[in-house]
UniProtKB/Swiss-Prot annotation:
Domain of life: Bacteria
Protein name: Small ribosomal subunit protein uS14B
Gene3D superfamilies: 30s Ribosomal Protein S14, Chain N
Ligand binding (Zn(2+)): 24, 27, 40, 43
GO MF annotation terms: rRNA binding; structural constituent of ribosome; zinc ion binding
Gene: rpsZ
Family per record: Belongs to the universal ribosomal protein uS14 family. Zinc-binding uS14 subfamily.
Keyword annotations: Metal-binding, Ribonucleoprotein, Ribosomal protein, RNA-binding, rRNA-binding, Zinc
Organism, as annotated: Mycobacterium tuberculosis (strain ATCC 25618 / H37Rv)
Function: Binds 16S rRNA, required for the assembly of 30S particles and may also be responsible for determining the conformation of the 16S rRNA at the A site.
Annotated transmembrane regions: none
GO annotation, biological process: translation
Amino acid sequence: MAKKALVNKAAGKPRFAVRAYTRCSKCGRPRAVYRKFGLCRICLREMAHAGELPGVQKSSW
């Protein structure tokens, strides 16, 4: 889990727009966040396997 202080810091509006960065909305992880879902790769995978993301399915070919 991410530190609560850093999650709160990222939630606020920065003084300069380039300082803004994405965090996972579920766990607060700052890296590997998919903008479309607002989730990190780990939470995205867990939720997709559990069927909690509509329209997302495991690919097979």
